[in-house]
From Swiss-Prot:
<dbReference type="InterPro" id="IPR036409">
    <property type="entry name" value="Aldolase_II/adducin_N_sf"/>
</dbReference>
<feature type="binding site">
    <location>
        <position position="143"/>
    </location>
    <ligand>
        <name>Zn(2+)</name>
    </ligand>
</feature>
<dbReference type="GO" id="GO:0019301">
    <property type="term" value="P:rhamnose catabolic process"/>
</dbReference>
<dbReference type="GO" id="GO:0019323">
    <property type="term" value="P:pentose catabolic process"/>
</dbReference>
<comment type="pathway">
    <text>Carbohydrate degradation; L-rhamnose degradation; glycerone phosphate from L-rhamnose: step 3/3.</text>
</comment>
<keyword id="KW-0684">Rhamnose metabolism</keyword>
<dbReference type="Pfam" id="PF00596">
    <property type="entry name" value="Aldolase_II"/>
</dbReference>
<comment type="similarity">
    <text>Belongs to the aldolase class II family. RhaD subfamily.</text>
</comment>
<dbReference type="InterPro" id="IPR013447">
    <property type="entry name" value="Rhamnulose-1-P_Aldolase"/>
</dbReference>
<dbReference type="GO" id="GO:0005829">
    <property type="term" value="C:cytosol"/>
</dbReference>
<dbReference type="GO" id="GO:0046872">
    <property type="term" value="F:metal ion binding"/>
</dbReference>
<feature type="binding site">
    <location>
        <position position="141"/>
    </location>
    <ligand>
        <name>Zn(2+)</name>
    </ligand>
</feature>
<dbReference type="GO" id="GO:0008994">
    <property type="term" value="F:rhamnulose-1-phosphate aldolase activity"/>
</dbReference>
<comment type="function">
    <text>Catalyzes the reversible cleavage of L-rhamnulose-1-phosphate to dihydroxyacetone phosphate (DHAP) and L-lactaldehyde.</text>
</comment>
<keyword id="KW-0456">Lyase</keyword>
<keyword id="KW-0963">Cytoplasm</keyword>
<comment type="subunit">
    <text>Homotetramer.</text>
</comment>
Length: 274
C-alpha cells in the first residue's frame, strides 16, 4: 500500500506551510491553505482512507465543486507542526455529489475539522475556476507582515494599493498585473467575508483583508506562494521607503506601460491611470 504522506500533494503542503511559518506569516494557528485535487491524485491512496469518513455539511451548497477532492489545513492547527504530524494537521476531503457537504477521507485525526475559513476558500475556488478556466487550484491565506502594515497607512483602495506595490518592486506588475483587491474590515470565519473575498477573486488573484492578512490564488502551491511572496517583498520595501521619508523617485506610468508590453501582460487600468 502506498503511503499518502509521501504523495506529491501532502509533501507540497508540508513544504508550503513550513516555508510560510519560516517567513513569519503564520503565527500560532494563523493562516490556511487548500489545494484542489483530481480523483486520479488520490486514487492510489484509498488504502490510507478512514474506514468511516466523517461527513460535514457546508453552510451553503457549492454544486460547482461537486465530487471534487481537496487537501486542506485544519482548524486551530499550527503551520509549524504540519511537518511533524501531517495526518493531525492536514486532511483530504471530498465534496459530495450535490455540493452540499464533504467527507473527510484522510487526516484531521482526533475529530479535527478543516480550517474555519473553508467557506472563503471554497467560494474563492469556485470563482477562480471560472476566471481561469480551471487553471487555478490553490487558495492560500496568511498574515504577511508588511502587507498588513501597509493597510494601516495606505488608502484601502484597489487602484492606490496596487500602484504602490507595482512601484515598490519592478517584478510586481509582471506577477500580478490584475492588481490587488481589498475588502473593508470584516469578521473572519464567516460566509459574509467568504462571499466578499470570492467577489474580488473574480477580478484579482490577490485580495487583502485590512489589518488581518492576504488571500492568494494560483495554479500550483509554488505559484501561489510566490505570488504572495512577491507582493510581500514589495510591501517590505515600501515600509522601509516610507520610514526613510518617502519616495524621491519611482517607476513612472510610461515605464510601467513599457514593462507590461515587454512581458505581454495587461496592467489594471485604474492603477495605471493614477
Amino acid at each position: 500500500m502506498q503511503n499518502i504522506t509521501q504523495s506529491w500533494f501532502v509533501q507540497g503542503m508540508i513544504k508550503a506551510t513550513t516555508d510560510a511559518w519560516l517567513k513569519g506569516w503564520d503565527e500560532r494557528n494563523g493562516g490556511n491553505l487548500t489545494l484542489r485535487l483530481d480523483d486520479a491524485d488520490i486514487a492510489p491512496y484509498h488504502g490510507n482512507f478512514h474506514a468511516q469518513p466523517r461527513y460535514i455539511p457546508l453552510s451553503q451548497p457549492m454544486p460547482l465543486l461537486a465530487n471534487t477532492p481537496f487537501i486542506v489545513t485544519g482548524s486551530g492547527k499550527f503551520f509549524r507542526n504540519v511537518q511533524l504530524d501531517p495526518a493531525a494537521n492536514l486532511g483530504v476531503v471530498k465534496v459530495d455529489s450535490d455540493g452540499a457537504g464533504y467527507h473527510i477521507l484522510w487526516g484531521l485525526t482526533n475529530e479535527a475539522v478543516p480550517t474555519s475559513e473553508l467557506p472563503a476558500h471554497f467560494l474563492s475556488h469556485c470563482e477562480r475556476i471560472k476566471a481561469t478556466n480551471g487553471k487555478d487550484r490553490v487558495i492560500m491565506h496568511c498574515h504577511a507582515t508588511n502587507l498588513i502594515a501597509l493597510t494601516y497607512v495606505l488608502e484601502n483602495d484597489t487602484a492606490v494599493f496596487t500602484r504602490q506595490l507595482w512601484e515598490g518592486s519592478t517584478e510586481c506588475l509582471v506577477v500580478f498585473p490584475d492588481g490587488v483587491g481589498i475588502l473593508p474590515w470584516m469578521v473572519p470565519g464567516t460566509d459574509e467575508i467568504g462571499q466578499a473575498t470570492a467577489q474580488e477573486m473574480q477580478k484579482h488573484s490577490l485580495v487583502l483583508w485590512p489589518f488581518h492578512g492576504v488571500f492568494g490564488s494560483g495554479s500550483t502551491l509554488d505559484e501561489t506562494f510566490g505570488l504572495i511572496d512577491t507582493a510581500e517583498k514589495s510591501a517590505q520595501v515600501l515600509v522601509k521607503v516610507y520610514s526613510m521619508g518617502g519616495m524621491k523617485q519611482t517607476i513612472s506610468r510610461e515605464e510601467l506601460i513599457a514593462l507590461g508590453k515587454r512581458f505581454g501582460v495587461t496592467p489594471l487600468a485604474s492603477a495605471l491611470a493614477l
